[in-house]
A protein has these predicted regions:
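Bacterial N-terminal signal peptides that target proteins for export
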Residues: 2-15
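Hydrophobic core
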Residues: 16, 20-24
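N-terminal accessory beta-strand-rich subdomains and adjacent acidic, glycine-rich linkers
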Residues: 35-355, 718, 722-723
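Aromatic-lined carbohydrate-binding/catalytic grooves of carbohydrate-active enzymes
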Residues: 360-445, 449-504
Length: 730
């Protein structure tokens, strides 16, 4: 018996020795987990100074463990969190590290995951992670997923060259770690950050099944090349009562467990032009809070078979997305584990990658003016002149004499033919406002007085009533002309200009403009739109469109003083000012709180200007929001009464007369200039809700601004703030 026992011990020792040798072989990174909150089936595959990365091979499930506080982030549903009420499809979805959809014929709803679908995964281990090569036999397609832990960041990438498909089925979408950092009902305290407008949060509390859907928005707005054209419905044939949702300006989202002091900011680095941000609170299909990026690889669309659209066929795109699909998770802990930490992390990321450069942040109130419009008159259209160059000089002189020492002014409707004679092909001003020479003199003369006048150029649209659009108009993927229609007065149909035609048109305009010795330009249209389109039998994706627009903006920025209207993040590096920064979100029902996230990222780098103050229903609250976000005020004014616009396309500008808002401009200028002098070019370091209705903004130069949205005076942290007011503490 003793001999048998000794022999058994020898066998066990030999097996342990073999196991130790295997784990020490080059390229083999599997290490048995030891942490109490790491299931035994997970093996450690990478480690940095701050984190350990664990992997469960069958489902490509990973766990991130913070080495300092021991907190973890799970990427798939753990057994102890399974409430047992989900069907097999959803259970498989939540247990899989990657989820795809497949397109077969005209159906794009097949779920493809690592649990319910036959697959083969082979792993190759690297110094800081692994590469998983995945093949789905049933659909005869596959891809590779590279996962690497670099310091405080987890990078997840599907290389473009690793994607393969065969004729039996196509890949529709790819969702990487769709449960990363999930939580069950209200088991965790915290929130999901979504880039809706300036920013919003969805709390991780129990939603009691109130919502049927969550946040699902395409990065950089919807793709007009695939969507059907619609006509605006106006109240009393005049007023647009439907507010468009805010666009996703930046490819980011986040999850934060505030009590555990761990979370992440996710940056969609590659493939973002064809990806959506998904953030679904518990109760939306399942009882788990989750956020992720969903990449579109191929779409189906409806193709008309004839010009009358009497016959159609649903088909998949002829080609797939050709781009890496990559998400970078910036891991945040301790004092950085909140949305302020997310904002700082994103700003530092942009700066480190040359995507955000410091512009002149000197304070200037923005006062825009409308030059000319058009209205129907018998057979022809006639000019409706609202503000001439002489009248602008008169108003400038009035403001200057009342202490407004600097100004930024965008001149709209300056071009021959008025505001909606687009695209603008050359520098030629409308004679009704004084002509080209008068506009040039206005810009150059007042620049010496620190009044910067920018000419507005809407470069996306083409007006078929005023210009030949035969060779310039965009056609959608289905080869039908892309038209924007409305029931407004005068002009009711516009086309998009082909991106490469836009490049040619803008090059000629900028050349003719700068030849006159002026170079202040406010660019719009192409700054907040990208789309797929067809041309001469070829299809062009949003990647192609964005690349063209980026080149256009970059080239113009080298030749002009360029300010951009609500630009997408990939254009921020070339913006000397950000026009029309949203101060809120789309106010979806599932959003619990709005935060000035984008403003926190950009403050101190790019001057930001609000939407127009004179069209705000609650000007007092809007003023406080601007102060809180570090955004400068904007006005859209005319010398003549706005009643003159009643029969023009600008009939919605119901209150613009300068005399009405003169005193407001002067007062806003004095107040915001004083605040800007205190904050200077400092960054926002923190944003906090210190009490109900009272917010605190801390700058990195030590300045603190308290904003009180309540009607009564409030004392917080030893500082008293009057009702509906703000206080700067240096």
């Amino acid at each position: 018996m003793a001999t048998k026992g000794f022999a058994l011990k020898r066998v066990i020792c030999m097996l342990l020795a073999v196991l130790m040798c295997i784990t020490c072989l080059p390229g083999t990174k599997l290490t048995a987990s030891a942490a109490a909150n790491i299931p035994s089936e997970y093996a450690q595959v990478a480690e940095s100074d701050s984190y350990k990365l664990y992997l469960y091979e069958p489902t490509m499930s990973v766990i991130l463990e913070n080495k300092t506080n021991g907190q973890v982030l799970y990427s798939t549903l753990m057994a102890e969190d399974d409430d047992g009420i989900n069907n097999k499809t959803w259970t498989a979805y939540m247990q899989s590290g990657i989820v795809l959809t497949a397109i077969k014929g005209a159906n794009d709803t097949y779920q493809v995951d690592l649990v319910s679908c036959p697959n083969e995964i082979s792993y190759e281990y690297t110094d800081n992670g692994f590469v998983a090569s995945i093949e789905f036999k049933e659909y005869d397609f596959g891809l590779a997923v590279e996962v690497s832990l670099e310091g405080d960041e987890l990078i997840v990438c599907v290389p473009e060259e690793s994607i393969y498909e065969n004729s039996s089925a196509y890949i529709g979408t790819v969702s990487l770690f769709p449960m990363m950092g999930y939580s069950y009902l209200d088991a965790k305290e915290g929130y999901m950050f979504i880039p809706d407008g300036n920013g919003a949060m969805i709390y991780l509390d129990d939603k009691d099944g109130r919502y049927a859907s969550g946040f699902s928005q395409v990065i950089y707005g919807s793709d007009a090349g695939f969507t059907d054209s619609t006509t605006e419905v106006l109240l009393w044939e005049r007023y647009d009562t439907v507010v468009d949702p805010e666009k996703v300006l930046a490819p980011i989202f986040g999850m934060m467990h505030t009590e555990d002091k761990i979370g992440y900011l996710a940056i969609v680095e590659d493939g973002n032009q064809r990806a959506s941000i998904e953030a679904h609170p518990n109760g939306v299909m399942v009882n788990y809070n989750r956020c992720f990026a969903k990449f579109t690889v191929r779409k189906i669309y409806v193709q008309p078979l004839n010009n009358s659209n009497s016959g159609t066929v649903t088909q998949a795109e002829a080609d797939r997305t050709h781009s890496n699909l990559q998400v970078r998770y910036v891991l945040l802990t301790d004092d950085a584990a909140d949305y302020s930490g997310m904002a700082v992390a994103y700003r530092e990321y942009l700066q480190a990658n040359g995507m955000l450069e410091a512009a002149d942040t000197e304070y200037k109130t923005r006062v825009d003016f409308l030059g000319t419009e058009r209205e129907e008159f018998m057979v022809f259209k006639r000019a409706v002149t609202m503000t001439t160059t002489e009248q602008m000089e008169e108003m400038f002189a009035d403001l200057q004499s009342n202490g407004v020492n600097s100004l930024l002014s965008v001149y709209k409707g300056w071009q021959a033919g008025g505001l909606y004679d687009v695209p603008i092909t050359k520098y030629k001003a409308d004679g009704e406002i004084g002509g080209t020479s008068a506009v040039t003199e206005l810009i150059t003369d007042w620049a010496e007085k620190n009044y910067d006048v920018y000419l507005y150029n809407e470069s996306l649209l083409s007006n078929p009533e005023e210009n030949n659009t035969t060779f310039n108009a965009v056609k959608k993927v289905n080869k039908r002309k892309l038209e924007i229609t409305s029931r407004d007065n005068v002009y009711q149909t516009f086309n998009y200009v082909l991106p490469f035609k836009t490049e040619t048109i803008l090059d000629k305009f900028v050349e003719s403009y700068t030849d006159k010795g002026v170079n202040n330009l406010a660019l719009a249209g192409i700054t907040d739109n990208i789309f797929s389109y067809s041309y001469s039998g070829k299809f062009y994706t949003r990647f192609d469109c964005a690349k063209t627009y980026e080149n256009i903006v970059s080239n113009i920025a080298d030749k002009t003083n360029l300010i951009l209207e609500e630009p997408f993040a990939y254009l921020w590096k070339d913006a000397q000012a950000f026009l029309d920064m949203p101060l809120g979100s789309s106010a979806y029902m599932y959003e619990d709180e709005e935060i000035p996230f984008m403003s926190m990222v950009l403050k101190g780098s790019i001057p930001m200007y609000s939407d127009y103050v004179n069209f705000q229903a609650n000007k007092q609250e809007f003023r406080l929001q601007m102060i809180e976000a570090g955004v400068y005020p904007s006005f859209y004014l005319t010398y003549e009464d706005s009643a003159d616009l009643i029969y023009t396309k600008s009939s919605d500008l119901y209150s613009t007369k300068y005399d009405t808002y003169r005193d407001s401009v002067i007062a806003y200028d004095a107040e915001f200039k004083a605040i800007a002098e205190a904050t200077a070019d400092a960054y926002i370091a923190r944003h906090d809700k210190v009490e109900t209705g009272v917010n605190k903004v801390t700058y990195d130069n030590g300045v603190v601004i308290y904003v009180n949205y309540t009607d009564n005076a409030v004392t917080v942290e030893g500082v008293t703030i009057d009702g509906l007011s703000a206080k700067v503490v240096k």
